[in-house]
């Protein structure tokens, strides 16, 4: 694990603006000085539709993904919809992640959404309304060039449901049933 005080997760086909890390770190430090429960920050994301051909990526379009999210703390209502906050748009205080992440399978295509629900049950996440992350969607449907989660959508749905059910059965997360 990183020696840093912060942690980001990056999908292999997603990308960040050059100022992503410095901007999120700066804003998170300012927010934490006022709201100590905020231990992570997520920025707006742009969806990039692309095709992979041989050694080239052809971008077909770029459009806002979650620009409807306002500055401030994320509410549970927002994360009711899967992928409203992509994994690669978040920066976490590492210490706030350690206990939460242990009960989630990092290699699962369904890792982030159940993890994020569990994380939000214990911490606040701040939205920075600046598009600094890019959520790439490969329009290819083959395993070599396509998106793993899209290609394995059935496995994603199954693992998501199992992770959600496990959280709902947990005494610690029973408040999520209300």
Range-by-range predicted roles:
Residues 1-154:
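Nucleotide-sugar donor-binding/catalytic module of glycosyltransferases
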Residues 139, 143-177:
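Hydrophobic helical membrane-anchoring modules
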């Amino acid at each position: 694990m990183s020696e840093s005080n912060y942690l980001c997760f990056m999908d292999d086909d997603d990308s960040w603006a050059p100022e992503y890390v410095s901007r999120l770190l700066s804003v998170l430090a300012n927010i934490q000085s006022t709201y100590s429960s905020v231990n992570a920050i997520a920025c707006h994301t742009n969806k990039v539709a692309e095709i992979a051909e041989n050694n080239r990526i052809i971008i077909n379009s770029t459009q806002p993904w979650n620009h409807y999210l306002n500055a401030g703390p994320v509410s549970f209502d927002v994360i009711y919809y899967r992928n409203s906050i992509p994994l690669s748009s978040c920066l976490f205080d590492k210490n706030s992640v350690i206990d939460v992440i242990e009960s989630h399978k990092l290699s699962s295509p369904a890792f982030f959404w159940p993890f994020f629900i569990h994380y939000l049950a214990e911490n606040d996440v701040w939205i920075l309304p600046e598009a600094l992350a890019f959520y790439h969607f490969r329009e290819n449907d083959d395993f070599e060039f396509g998106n793993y989660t899209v290609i394995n959508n059935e496995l994603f749905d199954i693992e998501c449901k199992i992770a959600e059910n496990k959280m709902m059965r947990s005494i610690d997360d029973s408040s999520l049933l209300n």
